[in-house]
Amino acid sequence: MAEEPRAPEALSSTFMLNMTSDASVRRIVRRIGTLARRRVQQLPDMETFSPEFDPELSEPPFLPFSAYVITGTAGAGKSTSVSCLHHTMDCLVTGATTVAAQNLSQTLRAYCPTVYSAFGFKSRHINMTQRVSSHGRSTDAALEELQRRDLAKYWPVLSDIAAEFRRTKPRGLYSGVSGPAFEVLRDMHQGQLWTTNVIVVDEAGTLSVHILTAVVFCYWFFNAWLRTPLYRRGRIPCIVCVGSPTQTDAFQSSFSHETQVNKIRECDNILTFLVGNPRAATYVDVARNWALFINNKRCTDVQFGHLMKTLEYGLELSPDILAYVDRFVVPRAAIMDPAQYVGWTRLFLSHAEVKTFLTTLHATLKTAGQGRAARGTGGDGGGVTMFTCPVECEVFLDPLAQYKTLVGLPGLTAHTWLQKNYARLGNYSQFADQDMVPVGTEQDEERVKVTYNVTYVKHSSVSVNCKTKKSICGYTGTFGDFMDTLEADSFVEAHGHEQPEYVYSFLARLIYGGIYAFSHGGHSLCENGEYVAELGAVPLPGRTWDPEVTAGMELGELPLEVAWDGERSPAAVFYARVLAPPAANSAPLCSLLNIYNDLRAYFRQCLDVAVRYGGREFRDLPFCTFTNNMLIRDNIEFTSDEPLLHGLLDYASTTENYTLLGYTHLNVFFGIRGKQQPQDAGSSRMPRLMVKDEAGFVCCLEHNTNKLYETIEDKSLNLCSIRDYGISSKLAMTIAKAQGLSLNKVAICFGSHRNIKPGHVYVALSRARHSNCVVMDRNPLSEMITGEGNPASGYIVDALKNSRALLVY
């Protein structure tokens, strides 16, 4: 009898919510396409912006632009529209922050720069002082005056970018290139401001208004200088601004060199400017060019979604909503107790609170470890291992002497400068939150070097702060998970797009080294004679390998100093007869693929034998393998008899969770594949951190080096260099840093802060994936006055009533 067809499984709520957005997202794409085709009749005269020009003193031409605004509640699917834009039209997708940019890169599987990188911003521009303009100060100032104000304010940076562009790009480079030929050239390279007029900016609510003007200026200047078809046709730039004006704020810092004080103040962000300024809103026709995403699709809890919409739109906080939020409140002592809510991310409002919590956590773990040691039950803090690594900060004396003369502070010493600028350095190099104490000072004729010790917890979750290189050198997990990864080819898909030969060579090395675990993995099957016999009967790989390849392979290329105890174990036979996989640059891709497939098949057969004798439970046994013969000293230091750690190069993602495993002093490849990067001067005492990614692969992280420049009277002085590890603990972070991240479980501590904004509550709550994964020490919403909130909420409510605005459910 024929089997009846099975009823289709019910579709998930998340899938249904995403599908309801499909038609509206298509409308967004069509509308942006229409804006992208707009042209200007009178081209702006970019010759005005000569090296001698100053918009504060002379009136610049108006630079036309169009804009499309995409806002919505947290997790509502705004990035869905960005993905559709990326796949359906030529556009430059950028993020306002590094986290936003790498989040987009991960989602789109394509490189997405920050908006600052897109218009040519470099590290030397960070400390260039922004000017105060006398233009555009009145409340009814025209858009031309507002644009001139922003140009004058940011002109020290923009003029330097323009000067560098003139030096590095030939003038009129594309003047003789036709439109079709230019499109071919454009498709061969990554998007730039001179290859497309559609620029997408994610998390635009964190950017000050002058960044919008900077993007528009650089678009017109770059295209005019190169004489691209975009400029010759008069194509107007279309800036697609994505984010939430109620979730985020833009801040501007100003540093006084005379007092050595850094002041930070809030300023208008791009989204609020476009939807709230009457002249800007009219110019870009925001009523027609605005899409609002309504439903939270990250967390499908109806009440939680209603809370998000209430905060997004600044609606009245009803007693029911306040009672719902009260459900999340727990005693503050419970949140501050490291022994409770283990594995949850603590969120605070200030860096000082984060640092205090981490210091308390480390002290608690250390005390627990000492107690266990005194009782003779182990001294690792209950299974927790802590370690310290040095961080180096160098102040250069010659630039400091010039700086003191220029700012009129002859008595300023290196130690005083470092003390007064420590907060700036911490934020600059992203180590402000860490449990770090000074341990030593060295001085010579050129520099003063201060060394700090930063404390880390093994197996804690960390995130990467910046664009950091990683060398993938091993795997740790289970036998079954490793086999599933090989079978699914997920690693190859994620890393093998540019140079797959390196990926296959790397995986072949891991499999080759991992065969040892079947015979000497410390499991009970090692003593089973029948298992050992059948494992030894598995046909060895390598018989079909290309003779030209195997001729260049030598035994011991991948040294595995294993004590065989005089036995001819299956592993001993394997390593005696099967040659180590060749390096990626010494064999053709087809041969490397053949070797990888043979080794993978052999590993699968060995695992099948182990499962037959050990049951399905064998798949869950611990398994680890490395490209080197790795030893772990004191449970924390990765070392090897080889001086160089072999690995696969890639960039670490700021949006991915990494588990901290320890550190290594081995030399590591971080330069071009096949070439060793020279050791940084002065970094010999700094180890490199070892982490595990979400898939189980072990990576070695490159050091993070930042150089702090001060620009005084057109002189750029490199005063300081900071070398750290470029990571932050996910045990605790500020609410501002959490913006754009999806955290599994969050414990929020608002402390005794006053004047907490609804946006703080909004961002903190919306980081969780489920309403059951949120706790906080108090409910700030119950303390807020009715109607208090972000002014942008009023503009959003007006848009909801506007039939021309697009609502995406």
From Swiss-Prot:
Cellular component aspect of the GO annotation: host cell nucleus
GO biological process: one example: bidirectional double-stranded viral DNA replication
Chain positions recorded as ATP binding sites: G72, T73, A74, G75, A76, G77, K78, S79
Subcellular location as annotated: Host nucleus
Major localization listed first in the record, in broad terms: host cell
Covalent S-S links between cysteines: none
Keywords noted in UniProt: ATP-binding, DNA replication, Helicase, Host nucleus, Hydrolase, Nucleotide-binding
E.C. code: 3.6.4.-
Top-level taxon: Viruses
Molecular function GO labels: ATP binding; helicase activity; hydrolase activity
Subunit structure: Associates with the primase and the primase-associated factor to form the helicase-primase complex.
Assigned protein family: Belongs to the herpesviridae helicase family.
Function: Component of the helicase/primase complex. Unwinds the DNA at the replication forks and generates single-stranded DNA for both leading and lagging strand synthesis. The primase synthesizes short RNA primers on the lagging strand that the polymerase elongates using dNTPs. Possesses helicase-like motifs and therefore may act as the helicase subunit of the complex.
Name of this chain's protein: DNA replication helicase
Organism of this sequence: Epstein-Barr virus (strain B95-8)
Lineage: Viruses, Duplodnaviria, Heunggongvirae, Peploviricota, Herviviricetes
Gene assigned in the entry: HELI
